[in-house]
């Protein structure tokens, strides 16, 4: 199922050398620029409520951890192997690692200055403060000593390091205390390590601990590692605690699976998850006050390069700040909103009846994800439904979708589910659901060898008037109601016969030995996504030569594929107007005269994570629009099962066109990519347009997306 096309999009006219490294942005540095934009949301004092700014610091920090676990780990492997191959922009692995360290160091400084210098004082003004244990009264310290003894002490494990005790294993993402001790009996110095338990909250809320009295109702917060460090004498009696120094470890967490050699994929992935714990250390976070002797000891025994040691003056592991979102201070958070539910409002909740009447397109989170959940629930209960087939990639830990599928099996339906076990960092969760589905009798498969199944597909077969009718859900996002509240994605419900035939054939390929490749409407990776996208770009060039008004609009999470970028450069050189909405990585450089001067790239970072993918071509006035799961990256085009599906109804095409135009008009949350590869906030003289806020306003007015007014395109 590989796309072996050898597109020659450069042959039509004489053009610059599109392999020139200056025409591309480094993938890793582009990702870091994206994470910088996430950090900027925390830095912006007037654009988010206070706790939401803290949330962005947490997201930035969590993103960066994952970046090191996967991308930096891969570069480290190349560097250690002496690889000198250059990236798309001409950099060696060593040069990329140097740039990453330089950028991350600067970002840490920005993040900590924002949190400690700006956000913490603002929290204090709202009655929330991080406090110093040493400032407490003796009576409060006594209460906390008892609290430590009963609630913290039992789950701590002090680990010594000496000739009789090997250096303790330090797990990935763990926060630890490196402790200097003096053995008073033998008058010698000792070293020990205590892991800060991840099973406990990282941030203690002192206002929730009985017996403490501070004389007011302020919310006082204490870092758990700080709290533990003040009670270490309970762990090491007859020892003098010299000092405790926090440190944090990030390990290589990529799982390499030789699927051709795997007897049982599920067991192989379980083994991979276990081995992930022992990946090499790719980042060591320490505080500046850690003595050189302890730092060198950690570097030696963790086998980490000194270039991968980062000094962080404040608390380590700020991804844990997400815990503060539990604080009940509505005035410090985004206002809640109720998404519209067009099916419920228009068809009284009978989803099959609604789909028979017309196709339905939902734009989450502004439109509720509940109709998708209701579709599976209704199918599970409906005696006329014979079978349900579905792909699952990331479904969450408490999934109503999976519960509905299990209920459908119990109701006698034939249920076939492709559970993608290789969904990174969701492997364990997906294994649990795969086994649960198997245990109730569902047909569970794990996909195709060598490919991740990332497509979002559901097919329901129902008996109607002595005939079988198929109903489809096709989406751009996961079957996860929790993320559907914070990710922007499309859901498409249809009973279109041609699409149903295509989806049926695709499920046969996924679950059986079908080698069907001739899909009539769907674009499927790794068969032909790159080929079809490039063909539509080339077609737009031909239309532009005839009519002079070629237009391409693409919205995606990442644009990395060199062949597609070259095709877009060719379109720009031919005069086609190209607008790209790329949330994250973008290796294409806009604004280069004679190459990309007709290309505009924006990235929208706001309250919701922009996750939908849309590919629009004017096509000489015969608009063509595809939605789906695929970004324009080699992994999506060559190594995953992805689906792009056409929107065939002209009214729904106009809906998406208007939404794309609104996003392109954003001058509040949009960042524009410059010709040097940097990003700057969109600044113009128009009235302020925050596209996500406009969509929220429309949802609050109970407007269906089918009523959105077309503006432009």
UniProtKB/Swiss-Prot annotation:
<dbReference type="InterPro" id="IPR024953">
    <property type="entry name" value="PP_kinase_middle"/>
</dbReference>
<dbReference type="GO" id="GO:0008976">
    <property type="term" value="F:polyphosphate kinase activity"/>
</dbReference>
<comment type="function">
    <text>Catalyzes the reversible transfer of the terminal phosphate of ATP to form a long-chain polyphosphate (polyP).</text>
</comment>
<dbReference type="GO" id="GO:0046872">
    <property type="term" value="F:metal ion binding"/>
</dbReference>
<feature type="binding site">
    <location>
        <position position="611"/>
    </location>
    <ligand>
        <name>ATP</name>
    </ligand>
</feature>
<feature type="active site" description="Phosphohistidine intermediate">
    <location>
        <position position="454"/>
    </location>
</feature>
<feature type="binding site">
    <location>
        <position position="63"/>
    </location>
    <ligand>
        <name>ATP</name>
    </ligand>
</feature>
<keyword id="KW-0597">Phosphoprotein</keyword>
<dbReference type="InterPro" id="IPR041108">
    <property type="entry name" value="PP_kinase_C_1"/>
</dbReference>
<keyword id="KW-0418">Kinase</keyword>
<dbReference type="InterPro" id="IPR036830">
    <property type="entry name" value="PP_kinase_middle_dom_sf"/>
</dbReference>
<dbReference type="GO" id="GO:0006799">
    <property type="term" value="P:polyphosphate biosynthetic process"/>
</dbReference>
<keyword id="KW-0460">Magnesium</keyword>
<feature type="binding site">
    <location>
        <position position="394"/>
    </location>
    <ligand>
        <name>Mg(2+)</name>
    </ligand>
</feature>
<dbReference type="InterPro" id="IPR025198">
    <property type="entry name" value="PPK_N_dom"/>
</dbReference>
<dbReference type="Pfam" id="PF13090">
    <property type="entry name" value="PP_kinase_C"/>
</dbReference>
<dbReference type="GO" id="GO:0005524">
    <property type="term" value="F:ATP binding"/>
</dbReference>
<feature type="binding site">
    <location>
        <position position="583"/>
    </location>
    <ligand>
        <name>ATP</name>
    </ligand>
</feature>
<dbReference type="Pfam" id="PF13089">
    <property type="entry name" value="PP_kinase_N"/>
</dbReference>
<keyword id="KW-0808">Transferase</keyword>
<dbReference type="Pfam" id="PF17941">
    <property type="entry name" value="PP_kinase_C_1"/>
</dbReference>
<keyword id="KW-0067">ATP-binding</keyword>
<keyword id="KW-0547">Nucleotide-binding</keyword>
<dbReference type="GO" id="GO:0009358">
    <property type="term" value="C:polyphosphate kinase complex"/>
</dbReference>
<dbReference type="InterPro" id="IPR025200">
    <property type="entry name" value="PPK_C_dom2"/>
</dbReference>
<protein>
    <recommendedName>
        <fullName>Polyphosphate kinase</fullName>
        <ecNumber>2.7.4.1</ecNumber>
    </recommendedName>
</protein>
<keyword id="KW-0479">Metal-binding</keyword>
<feature type="binding site">
    <location>
        <position position="424"/>
    </location>
    <ligand>
        <name>Mg(2+)</name>
    </ligand>
</feature>
<dbReference type="InterPro" id="IPR003414">
    <property type="entry name" value="PP_kinase"/>
</dbReference>
<comment type="similarity">
    <text>Belongs to the polyphosphate kinase 1 (PPK1) family.</text>
</comment>
<dbReference type="InterPro" id="IPR036832">
    <property type="entry name" value="PPK_N_dom_sf"/>
</dbReference>
<dbReference type="Pfam" id="PF02503">
    <property type="entry name" value="PP_kinase"/>
</dbReference>
<feature type="binding site">
    <location>
        <position position="487"/>
    </location>
    <ligand>
        <name>ATP</name>
    </ligand>
</feature>
């Amino acid at each position: 199922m590989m796309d072996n096309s050898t597109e020659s999009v450069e042959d039509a006219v004489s053009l610059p050398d599109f392999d020139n490294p200056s025409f591309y942005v480094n993938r890793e540095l582009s990702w870091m620029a994206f994470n910088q934009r996430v950090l900027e949301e925390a830095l912006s004092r007037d654009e988010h409520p206070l706790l939401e700014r803290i949330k962005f610091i947490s997201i930035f920090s969590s993103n960066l951890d994952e970046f090191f676990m996967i991308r930096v780990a891969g570069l480290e492997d190349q560097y250690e192997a002496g690889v000198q191959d250059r990236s798309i922009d001409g950099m060696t692995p060593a040069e990329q690692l140097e740039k990453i360290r330089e950028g991350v160091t600067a970002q840490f400084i920005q993040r900590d200055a924002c949190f400690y210098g700006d956000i913490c004082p603002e929290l204090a003004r709202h009655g929330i403060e991080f406090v110093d244990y040493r400032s407490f009264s003796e009576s409060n310290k006594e209460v906390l000593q008892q609290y430590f003894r009963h609630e913290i002490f039992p789950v701590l494990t002090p680990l010594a390091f000496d000739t009789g005790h090997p250096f303790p294993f330090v797990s990935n993402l763990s926060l630890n205390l490196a402790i200097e001790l003096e053995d008073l009996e033998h008058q010698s110095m000792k070293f020990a390590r205590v892991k800060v338990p991840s099973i406990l909250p990282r941030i203690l809320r002192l206002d929730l601990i009985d017996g403490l009295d501070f004389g007011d109702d302020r919310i006082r917060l204490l870092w758990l590692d700080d709290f533990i460090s003040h009670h270490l004498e309970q762990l090491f009696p007859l020892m003098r605690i010299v000092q405790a120094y926090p440190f944090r470890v990030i390990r290589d967490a990529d799982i390499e699976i030789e699927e051709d050699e795997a007897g049982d994929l599920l067991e192989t992935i379980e083994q991979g998850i276990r081995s992930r714990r022992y990946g090499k250390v790719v980042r060591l976070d320490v505080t500046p006050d850690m003595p050189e002797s302890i730092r060198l000891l950690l570097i030696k025994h963790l086998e980490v390069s000194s270039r991968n040691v980062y000094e962080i003056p404040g608390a380590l592991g700020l991804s844990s700040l997400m815990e503060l979102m539990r604080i009940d201070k509505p005035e410090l958070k985004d206002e809640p909103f109720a998404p519209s539910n067009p099916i419920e409002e228009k068809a009284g909740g009978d989803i099959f009846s609604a789909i028979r009447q017309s196709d339905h397109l939902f734009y989450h989170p502004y439109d509720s994800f509940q109709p998708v959940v209701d579709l599976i629930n209704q199918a599970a209960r409906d005696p006329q439904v014979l079978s349900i087939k579905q792909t699952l990639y990331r479904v969450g830990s408490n999934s109503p979708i999976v519960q509905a599928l299990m209920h459908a099996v119990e109701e006698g339906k034939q249920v076939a589910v492709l559970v993608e076990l290789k969904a990174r960092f969701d492997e364990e969760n997906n294994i649990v659901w795969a086994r649960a589905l198997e245990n109730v009798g569902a047909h569970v498969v794990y996909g195709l060898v060598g490919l991740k199944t990332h497509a979002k597909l559901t097919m329901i077969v129902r008996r109607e008037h002595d005939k079988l009718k198929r109903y489809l859900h096709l989406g751009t996002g996961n079957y996860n109601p929790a993320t559907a509240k914070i990710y922007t994605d499309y859901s498409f419900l249809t009973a279109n016969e041609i699409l149903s035939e295509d989806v049926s054939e695709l499920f046969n390929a996924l679950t059986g030995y079908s080698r069907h490749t001739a899909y009539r409407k769907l674009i499927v990776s790794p068969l032909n996504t790159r080929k079809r996208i490039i063909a539509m770009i080339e077609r737009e060039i031909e239309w532009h030569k005839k009519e002079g008004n070629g237009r391409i609009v693409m919205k995606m999470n990442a644009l990395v594929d060199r062949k597609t970028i070259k095709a877009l450069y060719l379109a720009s050189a031919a005069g086609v107007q190209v607008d790209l909405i790329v949330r994250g990585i973008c290796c294409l450089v806009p604004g280069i005269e004679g190459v990309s001067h007709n290309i505009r790239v924006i990235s929208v970072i706001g309250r919701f994570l922009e996750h939908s993918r849309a590919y629009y071509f004017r096509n000489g006035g015969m608009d063509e629009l595809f939605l789906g799961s695929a970004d324009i990256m080699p992994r999506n085009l060559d190594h995953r099962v992805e689906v792009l599906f056409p929107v065939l109804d002209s009214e729904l095409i106009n809906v998406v066109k208007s939404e794309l135009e609104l996003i392109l008009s954003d001058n509040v949350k949009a960042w524009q990519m410059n010709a040097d590869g940097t990003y700057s906030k969109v600044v113009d003289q128009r009235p302020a347009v925050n596209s996500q806020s406009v969509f929220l306003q429309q949802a609050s007015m109970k407007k269906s997306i089918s009523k959105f007014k077309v503006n432009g395109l």
